[in-house]
């Protein structure tokens, strides 16, 4: 039986996982998504064409690869159907777990209403209903994708839920659509999605028993993990490597190589602690050059320098074997670049990631910048200062950088 390799984001998401998954997936037979929902987004550039994926695994761009949405994902059928429409001939190469939970229209309404009520204490969620969908799952009142196969029964169950929760919906000023509209939507979802709904855990086990090569595609980033991230400014699922096991039905022994994706600088969407955020011209330049606007929301990302303390923390949580360093070309032309190698925290210098990160101040090491690396494909062709930056990251983290992205294009990647 083969083991599954895993790609996981090491920062606050948006590291560039999609490009690496797309590049590596041609070497695999199966690509799986294990958690999150359409709040996550991968942007992939192929031959000048931009693909924005939110639920469908990135392996979908390769027609000989099986793609699986696992039980740990919360699935918005409307979004999924829209995304599937971009691709031809999905039968036999795309599957959705019947155990995955549904993220329906009322979940988004709840999400947005609760954020409004929080005012300046808002988390900064995407408003896509992810938290409420996971809340229903954990409180054992959610509904699963497999229930779409009987839309009438699902509709009746939903109407009972809405009736029992009417005071809650009224308090949030949420108006539930009429029953006939809900049923019509559920029937439409079933008509499109039924051929793809199956027991994906068994499907995955059979593939691994047959020695098929499997790649697990992480969503978002480790520092957004519900347990290990910067709580409460986190997502509602486990984004660490262990979450891939529960989100697909795999044992920890099933995991092979873990590839950690790190961006050459740091970004964050929404609120929460961000020690290396740069509010000056460097931060603005990183945002503009890196086109740091959310794939899902279009929101401008907060930008700053690389935080090695957070990277080391995430790497231990995930058992990272090697890194892929993304968007190194965005640093082209900076006179100097910075790496945060420690924090000043409550009068001490620390090199660990505290639970109250808002009280940490970065301690920087400054390195000389470099000219353009755009499109370079050999490590020895990189400017000396770019190589020094890469090697300093390796020294500080103790992990080798095996992949280096030098442009958004799939083929502009150095493999070491």
UniProtKB/Swiss-Prot annotation:
Gene3D superfamilies according to UniProt: Adenylosuccinate Synthetase, subunit A, domain 1, Adenylosuccinate Synthetase, subunit A, domain 2, Adenylosuccinate Synthetase, subunit A, domain 3
GO cellular component, one term: cytoplasm
Binding residues annotated for GTP, in chain numbering: 13-19, 41-43, 301, 327-329, 405-407
Cofactor dependency: Mg(2+)
Origin: domain of life: Bacteria
Binding site for Mg(2+): 14, 41
Disulfide bridges in this chain: none
Name of the molecule in the record: Adenylosuccinate synthetase
